[in-house]
Amino acid sequence: QGDTLALYGDYLFYDGNTQIAQVRNNVRMENRTTTLTTDSLNYDRVANLGYFFDGGTLMDEENVLTSDWGEYSPATKMSVFNYEVKLVNPQFTLTSDTLRYNTATKIASIVGPSDIDSDESHIYSELGFYYTQQGQAELLNRSVLSNGGKTLTGDSLFYDRNKGVGEAFRNVEFIDAPNKNMLTGNYCHYSQNSGYAFATDEAMAVDFSQGDS
């Protein structure tokens, strides 16, 4: 496919029967846009799959990912990371114990408890997608968006970091702790820039500012 794979290391052990290469010390696996570095890598030529198990780093044009264990397929551009996972982008940091990431699309697939932190917000999610190039998230399973003492949650959540807009759908709850009020409904729109939020579809507003809602 015009995408050459290069594999470097201090020591190489290759089994011709299984076609598995074990590379140790200062290991580097590179293709055109992606570099994986570790001290212990096994590469399966049949499956075209490299995996590390003693800590590693995957870097592309957008993001740097580190974890204790991981695997990367140069053919599909898919990678899987487990244990102490961190994705670092100039705009945000995503931490998790399990994460899938595609180096072609730059989409991170959240499949376990994860935190996404930026200067603008904090997101907690256990399931969904983060489009790292676009700065957008599509999240499920009661994910939570927090910003300046305000939290937005719903059965599903959409967030656009560049626009500073969050939208929640079904069984929505927006809590404004500084102003002591809450919105509920089945849809809520929240603008971080203006601090404005509104809810629709069985919407209800609750004011706690007087000590009696």
Enumerate the language-model features and the residues they cover.
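Structural signature for solvent-exposed beta-strand/loop edge elements and short helix-capping sites
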Residues: 1-213
